């Protein structure tokens, strides 16, 4: 039987118009080998998608979302025959500097979309959003 999970992710834009990337911990996420990603995670059933998104941002960065998150895409992630993840990606604004949960992420950077598009060690689903021009 296949398990369905839903994840929420967000391109967090700061006051300078740059987006937050976090480097995933290779200890917690050995399959991604420390690639650069955007903040997010799996939802907790029973609470809204946006509440889950805000929670993930607070847990991973101690930042707050200060604008209404806008859904930009949904992606299917099927890593194996037992799991199907639907990843919903948003864009929203934030302010301040992140304080990382080092068990989740080891580094952060704020970059323009042009800079992100040149990053070689980028999560493939983030790269797809950039390549398709879904965010600018």
Model-found features: residue ranges?
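A structural signal for short, well-ordered beta-strand segments
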Residues: 8-10, 71, 90-92
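Conserved hydrophobic "DFG−1" position in protein kinase catalytic cores
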Residues: 12-13, 21, 92, 110
């Amino acid at each position: 039987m296949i398990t369905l999970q839903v994840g929420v992710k967000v391109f967090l834009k700061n006051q300078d118009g740059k987006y937050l990337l976090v480097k995933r911990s290779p200890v917690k996420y050995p399959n991604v080998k420390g690639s650069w990603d955007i903040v997010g995670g799996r939802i907790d059933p029973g609470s809204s998608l946006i509440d889950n998104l805000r929670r993930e941002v607070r847990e991973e960065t101690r930042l707050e979302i200060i604008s209404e998150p806008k859904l930009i895409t949904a992606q299917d992630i099927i890593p194996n025959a037992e799991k199907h993840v639907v990843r919903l990606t948003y864009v929203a604004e934030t302010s301040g500097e992140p304080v990382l949960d080092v068990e989740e992420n080891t580094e952060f950077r704020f970059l323009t979309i042009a800079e992100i598009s040149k990053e070689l060690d980028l999560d493939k689903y983030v790269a797809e959003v950039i390549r398709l021009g879904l965010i600018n």
